[in-house]
A protein has these predicted regions:
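Loop/helix patches that line or flank the sugar-binding groove of alpha-linked glycan CAZymes
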Residues: 1-163
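Buried hydrophobic-core signal for structured, non-transmembrane domains
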Residues: 164-168
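C-terminal beta-sandwich/jelly-roll accessory domains of carbohydrate-active enzymes
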Residues: 169-205
């Protein structure tokens, strides 16, 4: 939905991989000053969980973030060449391998390839006209969406040159407007409706 809105888009590192925050970094390996603030000491871990080096290659010691061994030059003399490189500044959990770029790159259904397709469509379909028109299917479902009891619903809007974004936050599948589906973030229901927490981009008929 964010990429369908007017204006610039901001993608935080790892978002394009579907990478979760690393919430269990040991206290003695944190770097964020928030974790060591006298008022919050060992109460709030700060932002380091979102700053862990990205996984590029699943089968390497640092998931491709840095070389496995040192190479001569740039502060490394011949006697150090071949030694193991230092660990990354923040620890990478083993489950990072499941989100590595080289794995997602070859998976047509991965989050990485979804982002690539969305960015390509954004470039193709978005114009300088920032007009956004709410569609009739933009509505509250009147039912909790599962997120702390909030009422869910559908957010749907039309962009200037005839395409629309529909996101279903409601508990029940939502009907889609007529048109050709350009992109969908997850499978539709058997009868073609949009499930909860799923977005579709549609070239309106």
């Amino acid at each position: 939905m964010e990429l369908a809105l007017p204006g610039s888009a901001y993608i935080y590192q790892g978002e394009e991989l579907g990478l979760p925050e690393v919430a269990d970094i040991p206290w003695d390996e944190l770097e964020d000053p928030t974790a060591f603030n006298r008022v919050r000491d060992q109460i709030e871990k700060g932002r380091d969980g979102c700053r862990v080096p990205l996984p590029w290659k699943a089968g390497t010691p640092t998931f491709g973030f840095s070389p496995a061994t040192k190479h001569e030059g740039a502060g490394v003399d011949a006697s150090q060449a071949g030694d193991p490189c230092e660990k990354p500044h923040l620890p990478q959990p083993q489950w990072f391998a499941d989100y590595a770029v080289d794995r997602e790159d070859t998976d047509s259904g991965s989050m990485l390839n979804l982002y690539r397709k969305a960015l390509g469509l954004r470039h193709e379909w978005m114009t300088a006209d920032t007009t956004l028109t709410w569609l009739d299917c933009d509505r509250s479902s009147g039912k909790p969406d599962g997120a702390e009891g909030h009422i869910g619903g559908t957010i749907a809007f039309r962009r200037a040159n005839g395409w629309a974004s529909v996101t279903n936050f409601g508990a029940e599948p939502a009907e889609l407007p007529a048109g050709d589906i350009l992109l969908v973030s997850g499978p539709l229901t058997d009868d073609g409706r949009l499930p909860q927490d799923t977005t579709a981009w549609i070239a309106l008929g």
